[in-house]
Design a protein with these regions (language model features):
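Sequence context surrounding c-type heme c attachment/ligation sites in exported
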Residues: 1-63, 67
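Short, functional "switch" segments adjacent to catalytic/cofactor/reactive centers
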Residues: 38-132
Length: 132
C-alpha cells in the first residue's frame, strides 16, 4: 500500500501505520482505510518458475522469482491501534460511481485515476517534469 500511494499519489504513508505523524495531514485511520483495499490480494509462486528464488539474507528469506498476484475475494485488515477491522474508504470525500459488486482494487484504481483526484494529477505532472 505504501508503494502505491507513493507512486501514484506522491504521498508517503509509511509512518502512519504506527502513529499519526505530527507534521502530516494524513492519519493512521486513513492509512488502514486505504490498506483495506489491498487486503484481498493473494500471491502465489508462478508455476513456470517453481523453485527459483530471489534475495534472501539472515534477516529476510528468499522470495519466489516470479509471483502471480490475484484477487482472493477474502481477507481484512485490522487497525493496529483499535484492533478493529478497517473498512475500505478513501482519505477524503469522493463520489463513488462504481457499484458494490466491483472488487476493492478496481474501486481504488478508479479513485486514484479519477479527474477529481488532485494528488494523481500533480504526481504524474511532477514525474514527467522530472524526466525532461
Amino acid at each position: 500500500m505504501e508503494n502505491t500511494t507513493h507512486l501514484f499519489l506522491a504521498v508517503r504513508f509509511n509512518c502512519n501505520k504506527c502513529h499519526d505523524p505530527p507534521f502530516e495531514r494524513w492519519t493512521q485511520d486513513q492509512y488502514y482505510s486505504l490498506a483495506a483495499f489491498f487486503s484481498q490480494i493473494g500471491r502465489k509462486e508462478d508455476a513456470r518458475f517453481l523453485g527459483k528464488k530471489i534475495g534472501g539474507s539472515a534477516v529476510e528469506g528468499a522470495k519466489p522469482l516470479v509471483e502471480v498476484i490475484f484477487n482472493s475475494g477474502a481477507g481484512e485488515v485490522t487497525h493496529l491501534r483499535t484492533s478493529e477491522v478497517a473498512a475500505p474508504s478513501f482519505p477524503y470525500e469522493h463520489e463513488d460511481t462504481i457499484g458494490e459488486e466491483v472488487p476493492r482494487l478496481e474501486k481504488l484504481a478508479h479513485w486514484i485515476t479519477s479527474s477529481d483526484n488532485q494528488y494523481f494529477a500533480s504526481s504524474y505532472a511532477n514525474r514527467l517534469w522530472g524526466y525532461m
